[in-house]
């Protein structure tokens, strides 16, 4: 029973931490997209699932919600797929002429194959340009694109619900109404593309990609600052009073307890903890080290044998210190730098295996999350801050499909002055996915050996 509860505790705390941190990461992408005027159709806590609880924003059209698959979150930013469909402008115009229409009817009218029409509809659906059409009692088929589509509400300028404040709701059509485009087919498609990720310039694309990473780093930084300032930091006190004694240690067997005041070690008088530390170090290797200490106003003495490679098992007294904002910020920033340096070492062949052996998968994170939660809120939030740093910097690695990999592709395209072929981007993404699958298996195996077996 204890084992089951331990596993459930690890799963709960691990999922809670990772889901919130990934959700915040995706929240960064969502906010950046909205700032750049890019449409976002969905923003969910949890992975995509046919079962969910959601609310559709009347102001920006985005569907906000939560799914049962609490393994992170996602923001459906329009236009992230680099696919280009040549007939998309004709299909879009036809849908808005009819208001509501089926894929077979579109194919017949435009003299296109149903596959081409469906591909165009999938692209336009991902752009937030059209909506699926389901008749009363009809439900979506999981894993399949709809075969019937309808228009979105449009105002005279062509803005729709996903365009936020620019959308003139009072003078707009209703969903499924036919609507006359104010320009030509190609021009209207270009206008729709301008509201997507693909329709933005290099700087805005880079900002959207980096926003999630920035939010993770900022989250970790603020968490640590809050902990250091509010909960405080436990620091050793330079007195000769023992704070803690390890159970079963040499000191414990000699009768020394926490709270005892060390008066001398091997004849050397001690008034500070540094005196105690130095005296123990100098006496190591002797078989008859005399230790005098005081407890409840009475003096006691004992003798211990301490080999050079052994520890006495005593710790200094500690106190909680609340740091000022500047010191808290400086200390928090040092952890940011340490995490960044660790991730950079991962890219150095001579350190790759060393860093991987020190890394952990979701199993290790779950176990350590449970342990941190048991130690108290401050410890749990400190651990969450470090994981947030790691999540942010790991996403910065130049390996697709991570944000850093996507940014690398954007940089290459900017330098080359043209888009990389879709086939090349797809191959690079598959290689990146395969690499991370191998890394996940390696770290999962290490975690199983470390925490389970």
PLM feature segments, named:
Residues 103, 109-110, 251-274:
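Conserved PDZ fold ligand-binding element
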Residues 25-28, 66, 251, 259-262, ...:
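Terminal peptide-recognition signature
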Residues 6, 10-86, 116, 120-190, ...:
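Small-residue-rich helix-interface/hinge motifs
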Residues 84-112:
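Short amphipathic alpha-helical interface segments
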Residues 264-290:
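PDZ domains, with a preference for the canonical peptide-binding region formed by the helix
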Residues 16, 211-229:
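Hydrophobic membrane-insertion alpha-helices, especially the h-region
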Residues 18-22, 216, 220, 387-395, ...:
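Alpha-helical transmembrane segments of multi-pass membrane proteins
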Residues 2-5, 174-207, 231, 235-246, ...:
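Functional transmembrane alpha-helices
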